[in-house]
């Protein structure tokens, strides 16, 4: 289906462009959310008539979005999750979790604004793009950790995996030492040296 974009759409095109997309994507996203019109002769004429108004509204919303962008640019959001010693999460961190974390910090964002290709499944720092406006994007950091203390250590640049490896190595060393130590064992008695025979006088 060919559509006329009413705003810039990431990886698709700019306002006013006529692009060809899959029917399902057009119906369920672009048309439903008012981001495009079917590229019919009537709608082309309709777009020409509303172009100036669309551009004015776009400039106004872009200005507001820029203010939000200034507030969140470079922001570090901390999300606490349970994970294995190897740093693999028991679950994942998704778009909803990031939106909730922002809300806890007094910032309201919509899920479509968070550009996350796949759920986060590991401990560490992850860079995420937030599209506060079709023409305004910023990068933020999501630090996923098992505790607030661990999150602070990750943000200081400490190698959490090395700490875990050292702890595991120490545990293995203690276990290995236990295998060779028998607390019930007793030292063998040392036989006394035989007494020297008296020399016959």
Swiss-Prot record:
RNA-binding in keyword set: yes
Protein name, entry field: Large ribosomal subunit protein bL9
Described function: Binds to the 23S rRNA.
GO MF, one annotated term: structural constituent of ribosome
GO BP: any one term: translation
InterPro entries: Ribosomal_bL9, Ribosomal_bL9/RNase_H1_N, Ribosomal_bL9_bac/chp, Ribosomal_bL9_C, Ribosomal_bL9_C_sf, Ribosomal_bL9_N, Ribosomal_bL9_N_sf
Compositional bias annotation for Basic and acidic residues: 155-170
Keywords per UniProt: Ribonucleoprotein, Ribosomal protein, RNA-binding, rRNA-binding
Organism: Bradyrhizobium diazoefficiens (strain JCM 10833 / BCRC 13528 / IAM 13628 / NBRC 14792 / USDA 110)
Pfam families for the chain: Ribosomal_L9_C, Ribosomal_L9_N
Gene that produces this protein: rplI
């Amino acid at each position: 289906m060919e559509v006329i974009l009413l705003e810039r759409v990431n990886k698709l095109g700019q306002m006013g462009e006529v692009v060809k997309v899959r029917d399902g994507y057009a119906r369920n996203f672009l048309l439903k959310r008012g981001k495009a019109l079917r590229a019919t002769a009537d709608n082309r004429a309709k777009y020409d008539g509303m172009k100036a108004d669309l551009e004015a509204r776009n400039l106004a919303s872009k200005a507001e979005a820029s203010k939000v962008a200034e507030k969140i640019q470079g922001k570090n959001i901390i999300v606490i999750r349970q994970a294995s010693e190897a740093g693999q999460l028991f679950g994942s961190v998704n778009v909803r979790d990031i939106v909730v974390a922002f809300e806890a910090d007094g910032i309201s964002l919509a899920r479509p604004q968070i550009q996350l290709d796949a759920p986060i499944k590991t401990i560490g720092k992850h860079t995420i793009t937030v599209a506060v406006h079709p023409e305004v994007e910023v990068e933020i950091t999501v630090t996923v950790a098992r505790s607030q203390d661990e999150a602070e250590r990750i943000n200081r640049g400490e190698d959490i995996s090395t700490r875990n490896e050292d702890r595991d190595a120490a545990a293995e060393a203690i276990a290995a030492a236990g295998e060779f130590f028998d607390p019930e064992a007793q030292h063998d008695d040392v036989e006394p040296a035989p007494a020297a025979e008296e020399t016959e006088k």
